[in-house]
Regions:
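Hydrophobic ligand-binding cavity/cleft-lining segments
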Residues: 1-45
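Short solvent-exposed loop/turn micro-motifs enriched in small/polar/acidic residues
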Residues: 3, 64, 94-96
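Hydrophobic alpha-helical core bundles mediating ligand binding, dimerization, or RNAP-core interactions
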Residues: 6, 23, 33, 86, ...
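Hydrophobic/aromatic beta-strand elements that line small-molecule binding cavities or substrate pockets
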Residues: 8-10, 67-73, 96-105
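Beta-strand/loop substructures that line and gate deep hydrophobic ligand-binding cavities in soluble
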Residues: 87-138
């Protein structure tokens, strides 16, 4: 990994509003997560996400854990990003990565760009030297395929 950001993109047949509605509903995140680590939405996930929203997720990567996420970038139907930190005692050891979705209207649908930004992550240097960036890139590509299926199911 050369920089601190990995991005994947896909043109999804559907409007930016349709895609954004899915992204802004944290309770739906487990349905399109391509990594298999997002298990269940927790606190704060029942309301539509907006700038400053805080929501929790139950996760599992080997062992179960929880994350707390805060929406830090928001432009309705164009951009949503949240920063993740560990829940409980993990908040002191992990966190800071940003998950960002940019939506651009194009002919035939919406160009969706998902980015994993570790520039502020506490484990940035560890991640950069591991296989996690390559695994994350593959997982993000799967997530975009699942988002496409979800949008086109309506």
């Amino acid at each position: 990994m050369d920089g601190d950001v990995i991005s994947v993109e896909r043109v999804i047949p559907g409007s930016p509003g349709q895609v954004f509605d899915l992204l802004a509903d944290a309770s739906k995140h487990p349905t399109f997560d391509g990594s298999g680590t997002v298990k269940k939405a927790r606190s704060g996930a029942s309301e539509r996400l907006t700038l400053g929203s805080v929501f929790g997720m139950s996760m599992k990567l080997g062992l179960p854990y929880r994350t707390v996420n805060e929406v830090i970038e928001y432009d309705e139907n164009r951009l949503i990003a949240w920063q993740t930190r560990g829940g409980g005692l993990l908040k002191y050891a992990i966190g800071g990565r940003i998950w960002r979705y940019e939506l651009i209207p194009v002919q035939g649908g919406t160009l969706v760009r998902e980015s994993w930004d570790i520039s502020q992550d506490k484990l940035r240097l560890v991640f950069k030297r591991s296989s996690l960036p390559a695994m994350t890139e593959k997982s993000m590509a799967r997530s975009l395929k699942r988002i496409e299926r979800a949008v086109n199911a309506h």
